């Protein structure tokens, strides 16, 4: 049960602002802002109509009463009654109505991604456009608001399982074009649900450059149609016959092969250009190197690199060709009306997390590191024996060091390993009253190490959680200051009231004395009146004197 706040009674008088919710609009969790008005040309004075404040849509109240819920406008201070974190149920101010949803991502202290279930959508909101979920209870003689403070337990339970594609995750969506070409398009996951014991996802792909997600219809796909955003790799120069992906015409990432590489000048900047052979169309086009990235295949929860034919033997080439041919088939979305072959999908899903973790310790990164430098320093054995690297195994590739002098690479790599260890200790030593800049600095340092292949996800998640808690603590401190201010004001009023009470007591004591004096005077007067009464009666009843009747 949430917190209860007294509510004003619902008034159905003309001009009153209310909130209404349609039962037949497909979503009963939307509360529209409306106003009650007199119905035009009505012969009944009590007949009113509801007008939505933005759309000027008017419907007679007596026709809507069985279709709509009506409640008063909630108090304006309910926004201060909510602590927002991942999973918190909220109402969001959107399109002149309050829509029910839950938070899937905390951007910072004042910006949040909110997920809506019907229709599926994710929208960013500022804190001042969010409020807690509200329930209005009306008992005729008394009414109140119930302020909810619950979290989406189902979403949090699923999030604890570390799903690869939870709502709010930016991914790449497999899209099939003409001639069977497979293109990977940036997309956003809006909803995850289970159907026939298989997870499915509602996503919206990113359209042509310059347009937003909202302009595209949503799609329902399975796990094999999605992959995470590949980690960035800095490439100084692409080799001939190297397989790459290019973001072309806003369509998405298309596969190609380098057939020519050269430098050129654009304006005042020197640019590297590559001529590519697009595999699907067999057309040769020229692209800036900044528009390219190495081709990697997402398979069994790990990224696999597709090597060029010049860097491997004939046996490897056959293996790569086999991989290339099976890759589109492996990643194409299924026909939603077809049955598909799902015999191995459940096993693949259950083993995906395990294989991804095993890949962190695989030998592929070690081989690439050995190409950059040879581990000659004895400090490597010390590093490998450190508890921190046993708890959080690391296998950095150090690829950016390829641009550094070879004799300096190993020392820089050792320095990064030590830096990673020290940063973890700094995270554990963070205090609740430290400056926000300390948290941001640590996060940026981990981000730099991630460019060299370090797995800092756990540390980054902890920093984000600590930042969220710190933001909540900061808001609570502000609330505490406000509460202390109110307490001080109330104490001041109490002291003033006590002073007034003492003054009234003094006045009452003086008044009591005056009353006593007045009562004493009153007693004397009463005594005098009694004496006069007796004298009057004695006088009136006295016998007449005999002399009064003597004749002269």
Swiss-Prot record:
Lineage top rank: taxon: Eukaryota
Every DUF724 domain range: 371-543
Pfam families: Agenet, DUF724
InterPro entries (UniProt xref): Agenet-like_dom (IPR008395), Agenet_dom_plant (IPR014002), DUF724 (IPR007930)
SMART domains recorded: Agenet (SM00743)
Keywords from the named record: Growth regulation, Transport
Keyword Ribonucleoprotein applies: no
Annotated function: May be involved in the polar growth of plant cells via transportation of RNAs.
Name used for this protein in its record: DUF724 domain-containing protein 10
Native source organism of the sequence: Arabidopsis thaliana
